[in-house]
Amino acid sequence: MSIFRADKKFERFEDVTPKILKDEKVKLLLCDLDNTLRLHSEKEPADELADWIEECRDAGVLIVIISNNGRKKMMQKFCEPIQVPCVWWAKKPMSTKLTETMKNYNFKPEETVMLGDKWSTDVLAAKFAKIRAWKVDHRKSVV
């Protein structure tokens, strides 16, 4: 497994379906926020994001947002309506916050995936944490 390559690639987060998560035995999905789940300029969760999170939750997958964004109040305000835990100021590509999150929620590396848009932060952090890295294209517009 090369640290220079994502394990799977998708166009957008919505392409990561509950079926894929189940087939891949994913129980914890760590997601980047900016330009992965939302445009950087979006202040509130889009309906598509809320629906996708609910589908994943119904499939038994815990989603935790892990972001390098350091604005705690903004992160909490965004994550609260969709009832998703968030970790801010993650300092990716360092893997500390990823491994802490797995430990805090009692998940093993083989049950965990990091989903993000950047090789230099999200994919590398996943590789350093010894979990799978799934990459989505940089989000440019709301679907």
Model regions and ranges:
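Acidic, Mg2+-coordinating phosphoryl-transfer loop and its flanking beta/alpha structural elements
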Residues: 115-143
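Substrate-recognition element of Asp-dependent hydrolases with the DxDx(T/V) motif
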Residues: 29-45, 49-76
